[in-house]
Amino acid sequence: MAKQSMIEREKKRAKMVAKYSAKRAELKKASVDMSLSFEERMEAMDKLAKLPRNASPVRQQNRCRLTGRPHGVYRKFGLSRNMLRQLAMQGDVPGLRKASW
């Protein structure tokens, strides 16, 4: 199980991304808009760079909802491979069963 502080840190990042997403999108759009002058585009890039680092969605890490494990997480289920296997073997994931061919 991951440290509780790491799980909380990811939750904090998710809130930060949601808070700044509209402003980031607006500044990114302005920074590539060729109808604006060079100075205006550079100003938009500067403002974008001054936003908090954790406001960028690329800094988010997918984590298992049950254990907080950062690697081997299936997006469809939000679970790590270990927990997905365990729950599937118990029959707790509807429609999922072990492959056999």
UniProtKB/Swiss-Prot annotation:
Ribosomal protein among keywords: yes
UniProt-listed GO biological process terms: translation
Assigned keywords, A-Z: Ribonucleoprotein, Ribosomal protein, RNA-binding, rRNA-binding
Matches recorded under InterPro entries: Ribosomal_uS14, Ribosomal_uS14_bac/plastid, Ribosomal_uS14_CS
Alphabetized Gene3D superfamilies for the sequence: 1.10.287.1480
A cellular component term, taken from the record's GO annotations: small ribosomal subunit
Record's keyword annotation contains Electron transport: no
Example of a GO MF term: structural constituent of ribosome
Pfam family, one: Ribosomal_S14
NCBIfam families: PRK08881.1
Assembly and interaction partners: Part of the 30S ribosomal subunit. Contacts proteins S3 and S10.
Free-text function comment from the UniProt entry: Binds 16S rRNA, required for the assembly of 30S particles and may also be responsible for determining the conformation of the 16S rRNA at the A site.
Entry similarity comment: Belongs to the universal ribosomal protein uS14 family.
Protein name, entry field: Small ribosomal subunit protein uS14
Naturally occurring in which organism (per UniProt): Hydrogenovibrio crunogenus (strain DSM 25203 / XCL-2)
Taxonomic lineage of the native organism: Bacteria, Pseudomonadati, Pseudomonadota, Gammaproteobacteria, Thiotrichales
